[in-house]
Every structure is written in C-alpha cells, then in structure tokens.
C-alpha cells in the first residue's frame, strides 16, 4: 500500500496561489483531470497526479477540525531545492538526521498545509 495523492480544498483565489506554489516550488505540472462536478486541478510528478486541488467554500470546511500535521515528499537535489525556496521567498527550517544520513526541509504552502521534503544521502552545506 502507498499514498496515492493528497487533496487540498480551498477557496478559488487561494487555490490559484496553491496551484502556482506547487508548480513553481515542486516543479509539478498541471495535467488531465476528469470532468468532476466541481472545479480544480490535478498536479503531476511525471505521470502520477500526486496533488489534487479542489475549490471549496469558506463555511463548512472552516468549521471542521483539521488534525493533519504535514505531508512528506522524498526528493534529490537539496541545494537546488533550497535555491528554489529562496527564489520564491519560502521560509523553511532544516533538520539533519545522522543515523539515517538524511536532511529534511519543513515549510508550508499558501493554504497552510505543512510540508516536509526529505533528501536521503544529502546534507546542508
């Protein structure tokens, strides 16, 4: 079993910011999305739609508690990814785990979703 995708639901204007964020920071590409009743986007990493974005209203979702802490991705190219975060003024913190030789970067998207990106075998210089 593996996680297929994450879905972020937000008002349309915020969703456009979130779409831009994932496309520019993560390099995801907007692709095919079935003709669902509501609007949204599927963002692809290669041939996999890993981030789904859907338009939601302000009222019911705002009242629902959210216990999701963060979503984690694994990547390569730590230095280039840090440069991308700097270029887009994304504040982040880093953590190195020597026992497994992995650097982690933690930050949030414009909707406030906590994100972690892991870089096995790479260390902040």
Which role fits each region the language model picked out?
Residues 1-19, 69-71, 125:
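N-terminal beta-strand motif that seeds the catalytic metal site of vicinal oxygen chelate
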Residues 9-50:
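Core segments of cupin and vicinal oxygen chelate
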Residues 37, 67, 101:
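Exposed loop/turn and edge beta-strand positions of beta-sandwich/beta-sheet ligand-binding modules
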Residues 50, 56-58:
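Short, conserved turn/kink motifs that form compact alpha/beta structural patches or helix kinks used as
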Residues 64-90:
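Mid-chain, well-packed structural core segment of small domains
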Residues 87-125:
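Vicinal oxygen chelate
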């Amino acid at each position: 079993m593996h996680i297929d995708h994450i879905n972020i639901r937000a008002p349309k204007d915020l969703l456009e910011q979130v779409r831009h964020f994932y496309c520019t920071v993560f390099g995801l590409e907007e692709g095919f999305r079935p003709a669902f009743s509501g609007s949204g986007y599927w963002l692809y990493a290669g041939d996999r739609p890993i981030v789904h974005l859907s338009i939601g209203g302000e009222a019911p979702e705002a009242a629902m508690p959210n216990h999701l802490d963060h979503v984690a991705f694994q990547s390569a190219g730590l230095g280039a990814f840090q440069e991308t975060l700097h270029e887009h003024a994304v504040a982040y913190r880093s953590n190195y785990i020597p026992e497994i030789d992995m650097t982690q970067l933690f930050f949030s998207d414009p909707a406030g979703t906590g994100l972690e990106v892991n870089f096995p075998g790479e260390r902040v210089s």
